[in-house]
Each structure stands twice: as C-alpha cells, then as structure tokens.
Amino acid sequence: MRTNPLALGVPTLVEKNVGHIVQIIGPVLDVVFSPGNMPNILNSLIIKGKDTAGQEINVTCEVQQLLGNNKVRAVAMSATDGLKRGMKVIDTGAPLSVPVGGATLGRIFNVIGEPVDNLGPVDARTTSPIHRPAPAFIQLDTKLSIFETGIKVVDLLAPYRRGGKIGLFGGAGVGKTVLIMELINNIAKAHGGVSVFGGVGERTREGNDLYVEMKESGVINEQDISGSKVALVYGQMNEPPGARMRVGLTALTMAEYFRDVNEQDVLLFIDNIFRFVQAGSEVSALLGRMPSAVGYQPTLSTEMGSLQERITSTKEGSITSIQAVYVPADDLTDPAPATTFAHLDATTVLSRGLAAKGIYPAVDPLDSTSTMLQPWIVGEEHYETAQGVKQTLQRYKELQDIIAILGLDELSEEDRLTVARARKIERFLSQPFFVAEVFTGSPGKYVGLVETIRGFKMILSGELDGLPEQAFYLVGNIDEATAKAMNLKVEN
C-alpha cells in the first residue's frame, strides 16, 4: 500500500529515469534507456507529449520484456495513436497503482485507475499496486458456509460457497450478464455487502446498461455517491489488449483493499474471464511467443493462476468471486474454459436448449455442480431434495428419445408420472428477475432457501400432481404457483 501525499492524486512525475521510443508496432513499444537504468519487468512507463495535431498525449505502458542493448518492450494500456519514435518515456519505478478504499464506491474506473464517469477526480491518496503476491497459506480461512443468492436453481442444485469462486459458463446470448446483474442486485439488498465489478472485454452497451440499472435500483446512490455499494472497473471490447489483460487485476486490487484493510466480505464480479485469457493470447502473440494448444499463450495456466490465487478468503475477510466464462463454440474442452474449471468451487452452466424453451435463468440443472452440495454442509433435507430433483430430471432426459419416437402413451404409468413431475420441476426452476422486469413483464422475486426446498419437496412428493405445468412457469415460491393454478382454472 502506498500513501500519496498529494490530496486528490494530482499526478507529478519525478523524471529520474527517462528513455525514448525506438519502435512502435500496434500496442507494443520498444524503448531505449541509458545503460544501468533499465526499468524492472512490470514497471509502469508514462509517455507524455503532443501529437502532430497538437493534441495532448498521455499513454501508460507496462514493461513486459528486457531485450538487451538497453532496450525494453512494453505493452500500452491505451491507444498508441499519435506516438512517434524519439518521444520521451518516463519510468515511474513501480508497477501500475490504482486508487482503493471508500473513494472508489459508486465510481467507474479504467484500467489505470482514472475515473471515466465525468463526476470529477477521485481521492487517490491511498493507492495500491495491481501486481502483488497471493495471501500466504497461514492467512487463509477455510470455513465452509453457503452463500444464499435468492435464485432457486442456484441455491438448490449448485449452491455457492461464501468466499468461493463460481463460474458462469455459457455461449453467446444465453444470459450470463443478466444473471450477474441479478446477483449484484440481490446481494446488495440481502447482504448489504460491497461489490466490485470488473468488465473485462465485454460490450460497452452492457457496461452502460449495468451502470444505469445500478443507479435505478439504488446500488449506486446518485445523491450520496459514498453511500454506494459497488465500484466499477471497465476495460471494454474496443480497448487495446494490454488494458483488457490488466483490468481484472485492477478490479481485484480494489476488492483486496476492502477485504484486507476494511475487513469486509466482498463480492468480485468478472465479466468475462475468457476475455482476460483472450487478451493475454493477443499480447503473447504481439511479444513473439510461440503459441500453445489452439493458439493460446504458452503461459495460460500461469496467468490464470496468478489472478485466481489472489481471490480467496483470509482471516480478515472474504472475496466471493462470480466469473462469467464465455465458452467458444459451446465447447467446454477449449483450453480457456478448461483452465478456469480447475479453480472453481461451483459451476453454473447455462444451456442454449433451456434458453430456446424460454426457461430463464437458463441454468442447466444436470450440468451445474458445486462442492458445497454435501449432506454434512447443506443438511440432509436440502441434499435429499436436490438429489430427488436431479434424478427426476435425469430420468426425463433418458425417456425423451422414446417419447420422440413412440409418444407419451407408450410409457408406463410410473414413467408418465415422472415426466409430468419433471416438466413441473423444469418450469419451477425458472424465476422472474428484478433486473429483467422490462423483458418479462413480471415483478422480480427473491426466494429464500427454506422456501425453495419446501416447493421442490411438494412437487416430488406428488402433492401438486393435479396442477397444470404452466402454473409453475416464472413464479417465485410454491404458493404463487398454486395461486396461479387457481387463476388459470377460473379463466378456463
């Protein structure tokens, strides 16, 4: 942690070590320094000056390689337009540092910690470097407890661990970002904790939607910014690869401060962790490294590990991380999602088939897993109910070929009952979201774990066999389903 004596972080650079640009290839710069004054790897370099049109230039780079002959190769964190050979480069003598603490809440930052929301400067007296070691083994906390989200399918079948790492897997357009927005909304309301959102290489429109959504739902308090519950860090699709590769670390650094210094439980959302790998792959190619499997960088697992190992619970506080993972071509064996799997406590897999049926959230109940779904952690009742739901859905899946060829009438009485219950369960796993009220037209619902278990137990026991399956679609708890069934009966 470094404390900057300059209030409001007015940057002044001491020009101790100055070099100049000798080569520019896209976002990669080669810089020459005087002998004996080479910057360290990961040091931050700053280039200031004017372009040919007289516009001010202020580009931050990060040293990646020492090339010999007093040359270093650095990757730019913003566009290199307007840079020329011979321009002066200042070595800051330290890694990139970003503002941390209460001043970051309610604000949007870019990768180098500058506010980009037009709300004026941020108090940057307390800053922290984005590269730091993971907590030591003896500092880690190993308590097991469930993190309730209020989303039925998640809490019942793949519960999240407090202080754990959760992956949301899905192809394009199946609802990862909407699910993340709902989790931020529910957690801010139910747990009152602080969240940090890292937008890594996703759409600018989604980032803007999220910001507006947070202001409307009160997660960001426009009247009193310091009363907000979330800090946002964006490095969107249009940014150079250097920015997309480091923006996850910037968000993580802000979350670590809340955990280590403020001793809070923090939520870290990363959307999308695949783009972090993708940016690393682009940078790796630009630096001339030999590609590995499927064209990814050879350092894939090292880069992923250095980020993921810092996301953990210590004796001071916890970071619970929820990461969206884009799955290229819906192939879970691709090196990027496969490397991510190794670090996760729970996986929430989103299914295109369920999304096509209109069942949202489109969480696949059979593919999603959690290390927390053990009877000695969640209790016998929860475990038995979850297993009953999975067995019913698995049997329904096995029978689908027979139904497609021969029809329902050819099934035994027992199998027909299983199919009817499975279809009710499938629909009851859908739920109206607060953040999707504009799409669904239904008010959002937060369903507690006790209510969720009670509802599914009633379906499995056969108490609700007489109700039509459409009564279970897009409702909150089971009482709403029975009320909806009564309304349907009256209408018919």
UniProtKB/Swiss-Prot annotation:
Catalytic activity from the UniProt record: ATP + H2O + 4 H(+)(in) = ADP + phosphate + 5 H(+)(out)
Q: What is its main location?
A: plastid
Q: Which domain of life is it from?
A: Eukaryota
| Membrane topology of this protein | Peripheral membrane protein
Q: Does the keyword Magnesium apply?
A: no
Q: Which InterPro entries match?
A: AAA+_ATPase, ATP-synt_VA_C, ATP_synth_F1_bsu, ATPase_a/bsu_AS, ATPase_alpha/beta_chains, ATPase_F1/V1/A1_a/bsu_N, ATPase_F1/V1/A1_a/bsu_N_sf, ATPase_F1/V1/A1_a/bsu_nucl-bd
Q: Which GO terms describe its molecular function?
A: ATP binding; ATP hydrolysis activity; proton-transporting ATP synthase activity, rotational mechanism
Tell me which PROSITE patterns the record gives.
Answer: ATPASE_ALPHA_BETA (PS00152)
Q: What is its EC number?
A: 7.1.2.2
Q: Which UniProt keywords apply?
A: ATP synthesis, ATP-binding, CF(1), Chloroplast, Hydrogen ion transport, Ion transport, Membrane, Nucleotide-binding, Plastid, Thylakoid, Translocase, Transport
- Record's GO cellular component terms: chloroplast thylakoid membrane; mitochondrion; proton-transporting ATP synthase complex
Q: What class of enzyme is it?
A: translocase
Q: What GO biological process terms are annotated to this protein in UniProt? A: proton motive force-driven mitochondrial ATP synthesis
Q: Where does ATP bind?
A: 170-177
* Residue intervals passing through the bilayer: none
Q: Where in the cell is it found?
A: Plastid, Chloroplast thylakoid membrane
UniProt keyword annotation of Ion transport present: yes
> Which family, according to the similarity comment?
Belongs to the ATPase alpha/beta chains family.
Describe the subunit structure.
Answer: F-type ATPases have 2 components, CF(1) - the catalytic core - and CF(0) - the membrane proton channel. CF(1) has five subunits: alpha(3), beta(3), gamma(1), delta(1), epsilon(1). CF(0) has four main subunits: a(1), b(1), b'(1) and c(9-12).
* Biological role stated in the UniProt entry: Produces ATP from ADP in the presence of a proton gradient across the membrane. The catalytic sites are hosted primarily by the beta subunits.
Q: What is this protein called?
A: ATP synthase subunit beta, chloroplastic
